[in-house]
């Protein structure tokens, strides 16, 4: 179970996701927790070892195959950045996220990610698809072609 957005395992707001804006896109809206997002990403440890990625080599949005997931259904650090960092990511944005273990996979880790791991993700938001039945104006949603 993940801690609530922006909170650590004890519920205190003293852990932060650090976001470095690499590229500003042309999107105008950020995802909400129930939206499905399409992203290109690379995850690595602070020593530079890559543990997960959706593309090989340098990011080329034209040839990369984005992964999709629900914005509120991932580790708290990702959800926080997608929805709240600098007002939330917009379609076309590329950010580098520095996620402390409390907002990542915690003290227990996950799969090949050891506990207490600080994670670095390079994330490119490609598209946002709202949950069916969610009321949003057409102008609020951009979806990748």
Question: PLM features: what roles do these ranges have?
Answer:
Residues 1-145:
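Cross-family detector of peptidyl-prolyl cis-trans isomerase
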């Amino acid at each position: 179970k993940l801690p609530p957005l922006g909170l650590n395992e004890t519920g205190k707001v003293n852990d932060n996701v650090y976001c470095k804006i690499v590229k500003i896109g042309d999107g105008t809206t950020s995802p909400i927790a129930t939206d499905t997002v399409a992203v290109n990403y690379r995850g690595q440890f602070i020593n530079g070892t890559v543990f997960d990625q959706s593309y090989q080599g340098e990011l080329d949005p034209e040839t990369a195959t984005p992964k999709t997931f629900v914005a509120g259904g991932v580790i708290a650090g990702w959800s926080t950045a997608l929805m709240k960092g600098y007002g939330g990511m917009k379609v076309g944005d590329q950010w580098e996220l520095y996620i402390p273990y409390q907002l990542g996979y915690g003290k227990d880790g996950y799969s090949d990610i050891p506990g207490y791991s600080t994670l670095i993700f390079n994330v490119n938001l490609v598209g946002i698809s709202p949950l069916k039945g969610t009321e949003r104006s057409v102008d609020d949603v951009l979806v990748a072609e």
